[in-house]
Amino acid sequence: MGLSNRAIIIDGKNHLLGRLASIVAKKLLQGDKVVVLRAEEIVISGNFHRSKLKYMSFLRKRCNINPARGAFHYRAPGKIFWRTVRGMLPHKTNRGNEALKNLRAYEGVPAKYQKTKSLHAPSASRFRLQPRRKFCVVGRLSHEVGWQFQDVVAKLEAKRKVKGAAYFEQKKKMDKLAVQAKKNAAPKIAQYQKIIEALGYN
């Protein structure tokens, strides 16, 4: 069990797939709960066509006797990230399996996480790549190998961003009014403020 029951929320945008997965795997083994948002914006280094050829090769792997036994090929970005993390965990042991249960990866930002702060992992950032290095996003790869909800997620994200921008503008106005109210009240409460500060409070 981790030191806190609260989940670590990470925004997947502009993170490298393998590097972020290794950080998340370590946190899971330490007992933390991890939530990864916007999995479709996670980045894979290298040319897109090379990444697609590698994934198409993976899609051809199956059980000859009965393909329903596996291998199971996930198309959704969240599931691709989940499987990447699974490969970094001892998931066939009880410890690894329990750790994997604490991982959630979502496309877009679900409603319950829209008002929570998300973290960024600098060591897994896309900007660690060389400036001329090519890269592609997992969302595009998923779309081209069979994921059908790219447009749906894009529409929901556009709505969320408009709503978030309106909320931010309203918050700026309220903060400005609060600062002005403190300035207006300062002369009236000056004598009381001196008493409070004399007692050791700010």
Curated annotation (Swiss-Prot):
<keyword id="KW-0687">Ribonucleoprotein</keyword>
<dbReference type="GO" id="GO:0003729">
    <property type="term" value="F:mRNA binding"/>
</dbReference>
<dbReference type="InterPro" id="IPR005755">
    <property type="entry name" value="Ribosomal_uL13_euk/arc"/>
</dbReference>
<dbReference type="GO" id="GO:0005840">
    <property type="term" value="C:ribosome"/>
</dbReference>
<dbReference type="InterPro" id="IPR005822">
    <property type="entry name" value="Ribosomal_uL13"/>
</dbReference>
<dbReference type="GO" id="GO:0017148">
    <property type="term" value="P:negative regulation of translation"/>
</dbReference>
<comment type="similarity">
    <text>Belongs to the universal ribosomal protein uL13 family.</text>
</comment>
<dbReference type="GO" id="GO:0022625">
    <property type="term" value="C:cytosolic large ribosomal subunit"/>
</dbReference>
<dbReference type="Pfam" id="PF00572">
    <property type="entry name" value="Ribosomal_L13"/>
</dbReference>
<keyword id="KW-0689">Ribosomal protein</keyword>
<dbReference type="InterPro" id="IPR036899">
    <property type="entry name" value="Ribosomal_uL13_sf"/>
</dbReference>
<dbReference type="GO" id="GO:0003735">
    <property type="term" value="F:structural constituent of ribosome"/>
</dbReference>
<dbReference type="InterPro" id="IPR023563">
    <property type="entry name" value="Ribosomal_uL13_CS"/>
</dbReference>
<protein>
    <recommendedName>
        <fullName>Large ribosomal subunit protein uL13</fullName>
    </recommendedName>
</protein>
<dbReference type="GO" id="GO:0006412">
    <property type="term" value="P:translation"/>
</dbReference>
